Amino acid sequence: MASKAKTGRDDEATSAVELTEATESAVARTDGDSTTDTASKLGHHSFLSRLYTGTGAFEVVGRRRLWFGVSGAIVAVAIASIVFRGFTFGIDFKGGTTVSFPRGSTQVAQVEDVYYRALGSEPQSVVIVGAGASATVQIRSETLTSDQTAKLRDALFEAFGPKGTDGQPSKQAISDSAVSETWGGQITKKAVIALVVFLVLVALYITVRYERYMTISAITAMLFDLTVTAGVYSLVGFEVTPATVIGLLTILGFSLYDTVIVFDKVEENTHGFQHTTRRTFAEQANLAINQTFMRSINTSLIGVLPVLALMVVAVWLLGVGTLKDLALVQLIGIIIGTYSSIFFATPLLVTLRERTELVRNHTRRVLKRRNSGSPAGSEDASTDGGEQPAAADEQSLVGITQASSQSAPRAAQGSSKPAPGARPVRPVGTRRPTGKRNAGRR
């Protein structure tokens, strides 16, 4: 009888252990596929709701050939525009003369007419800088000789009679300055040096903090942003000024920041990916994109708001062309940087990583497990030796749970020592502990 009771207790303990293992495996599998299950359950939710919660299951990495084609077409158009159309360089790069005087009630059309009658040619630009009593008229033209400058000043004084600081009409109120074309070249040279130093520091940091494949992807994405932004300027015909060059450098920081946000999530999702066969590396990277999608959009929107405010102040209130050029290149760069961090940098990272032996072997194992229909951990148990087996489905889990709920109490009744995994059994005595000190003493 004792041997039979012992055998019964062993059977009950074994079933309880199997229940615990199956339950943990089912929970692990449920957690591993939470994004897919959530996306299927939230199918009736709106697009914005799924986008905000990160459960949209938008396929980005799986369609990376499409995004590579779109990105390649954009770069091709940008390069073709740069080569065949070229840039519209401002006076700081081509050299020229700037003439300015207090506005008063002067209109731009009147200034252009006086300039044409005085010199027989059109000015490059006539803008009104500032507002109110401090507003000035700024004329930019090709390089003028001393005689041409004096003739233009006389014509402007006769036509508009600008007033000096004492409130009386004076020729001294009209100022002129010449800009050498070498100054813009010096600014560009220094900007290129700063760009190279920036790229080197970025490459070192990402390589040390993450990995070399992320470095290659991030640097390529930044070059993509620079090329497309420059192509937009060439295609639309925006004037290139030193402020434009400075703006190109500022958008690199935003582009890198947005890219690193996604890369950090990719690293978190793919940490130890080779020890599991639930998802491939590409699927984990796509999950990271979905989880950071809304964050990238919110970051871009917050970055665009001050840029738009700067453009409004520069164009409608102050009329400062330098601020307009700076804000314009930043606006274009932020939009392109957001696109590249989601649809270009991460798909490129996945493409580079899939060329490695580790990722290729892991992808084959995942696909083999899915095709065979075996549990997620059966193959890992023999190859990696550390992963728990997953339950086949929820119905089997429910059946095991019901069986255990009946067997666990019997095991507890047959022995004072509870079996592993069995439910706790309350004491049978009539008097329960009160929790008070010295309660049982008389």
Curated annotation (Swiss-Prot):
- Keywords for this protein: Cell membrane, Membrane, Protein transport, Translocation, Transmembrane, Transmembrane helix, Transport
Q: Kindly list the GO molecular function terms attached to this UniProt entry.
A: protein-transporting ATPase activity
For bias kind Low complexity, which ranges apply?
402-432
TM regions (residue ranges) = 67-87, 187-207, 218-238, 243-263, 301-321, 331-351
Location, primary (coarse class): membrane
Q: Name one GO cellular component term.
A: peptidoglycan-based cell wall
Taxonomic superkingdom:
Bacteria
* Region spans: Disordered: 1-39, 366-442
* BP-aspect Gene Ontology terms: intracellular protein transmembrane transport; protein targeting; protein transport; protein transport by the Sec complex
Cellular compartments annotated: Cell membrane
Comp. bias regions, Basic residues: 433-442
List the membrane topology term(s).
Multi-pass membrane protein
Give the Gene3D superfamilies listed for this entry. Multidrug efflux transporter AcrB transmembrane domain
- What is the role of this chain? Part of the Sec protein translocase complex. Interacts with the SecYEG preprotein conducting channel. SecDF uses the proton motive force (PMF) to complete protein translocation after the ATP-dependent function of SecA.
Q: How does it assemble?
A: Forms a complex with SecD. Part of the essential Sec protein translocation apparatus which comprises SecA, SecYEG and auxiliary proteins SecDF. Other proteins may also be involved.
Family the UniProt entry places it in: Belongs to the SecD/SecF family. SecF subfamily.
Q: What is this protein called?
A: Protein translocase subunit SecF
Q: Please name the source species.
A: Mycobacterium tuberculosis (strain ATCC 25618 / H37Rv)
Q: Which gene encodes it?
A: secF
